[in-house]
């Protein structure tokens, strides 16, 4: 996995477009993330974390965090689409003053989620626990920014 590019490079490449802020779409994404987060916590409490549900939790965590990043981007007047959009959204975390180690972890989540969706990658309980911890640590921070 190579290092993630700077956000401005995604603008230059046309992957991120500058647009009028879209607060209504951002509000929708925030609400979706909130519902997804609450559901995630409920399912974890009732079912627990196992190897058998690790992939599902990892995908859900990634989606929750990226919905909040997309919401913040929309409020700030940015929209990522097409090939490289997910990488651009992860890169946007740097502009939000996330630590580089957290940007790299989010990029690793993106990489593994892509592997799950397109290549049949199977992840384990241990990694799912790390992802859930990361999500819990960053959910409120992102939500407050959005």
Stretches with model-predicted labels:
Residues 1-146:
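Terminal alpha-helical segments
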């Amino acid at each position: 996995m190579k290092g993630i590019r700077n956000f401005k490079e995604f603008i230059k490449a046309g992957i991120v477009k500058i647009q009028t802020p879209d607060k209504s779409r951002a509000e929708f994404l925030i609400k979706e993330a909130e519902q997804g987060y609450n559901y995630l916590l409920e399912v974890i409490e009732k079912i627990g974390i196992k190897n058998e549900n690790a992939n599902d939790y990892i995908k859900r965590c990634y989606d929750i965090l990226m919905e909040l990043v997309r919401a913040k981007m929309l409020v700030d007047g940015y929209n990522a689409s097409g090939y490289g959009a997910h990488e651009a959204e992860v890169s946007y975390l740097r502009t939000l003053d996330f630590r580089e180690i957290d940007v790299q972890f989010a990029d690793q989540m993106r990489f593994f989620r892509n592997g799950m969706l397109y290549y049949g990658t199977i992840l384990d309980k241990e990694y799912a626990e790390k992802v859930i911890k990361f999500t819990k640590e960053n959910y409120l921070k992102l939500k407050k920014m959005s």
